[in-house]
From Swiss-Prot:
It is found in: Cytoplasm. Its main location: cytoplasm. Involved in urease metallocenter assembly. Binds nickel. Probably functions as a nickel donor during metallocenter assembly. HAMAP family: UreE (MF_00822). GO terms for molecular function: nickel cation binding; unfolded protein binding. One of its GO terms (biological process) is protein folding. The gene is ureE. GO terms for cellular component: cytoplasm. This is Urease accessory protein UreE.
Amino acid sequence: MIKFTHLVHHHHDEHHHNEEHAHNATELTICLTMQERTKSRLKVMLSDGSEAGLFLPRGTVLKEHDIVESDDGVQAMITAAEETVSTVYSDDLLLLAKACYHLGNRHVPLQVEAGWCRYLHDHVLDDMVQRLGLNVKVEQAKYQPEPGAYGGSSAGSHDGHHH
């Protein structure tokens, strides 16, 4: 079993002389949920169907396109799994900012982008956001909350959350 022991950050500015290295790095992928990307020890399935293990330094949080490497040089790229999320889209940026404030005040790990925010689906939070006057779209999408929101939080307390 391959043991991935360290993280090699993905660079978006690959040049032609790095093409072979980049190709080798992306041959294998590991698709993980946000919760799985916060674990430093985890049994995973590689894109070729084989099992591997993550043995990363404690506190490592993986992001999409990060590359992990084994001691013998095998690399795999992390991809974000689609998850059931609630996404709030709005052109009213003040209202959207208020929703982000209220969600953050409840320590909800939150992905914040231009014109929208996203959190793991929770009907209680959806109701709160709708009471603010915003629409919530429940969808399957990749989820990458702002850094720091999930260190030791109570992210495992979602009633009715199934895998």
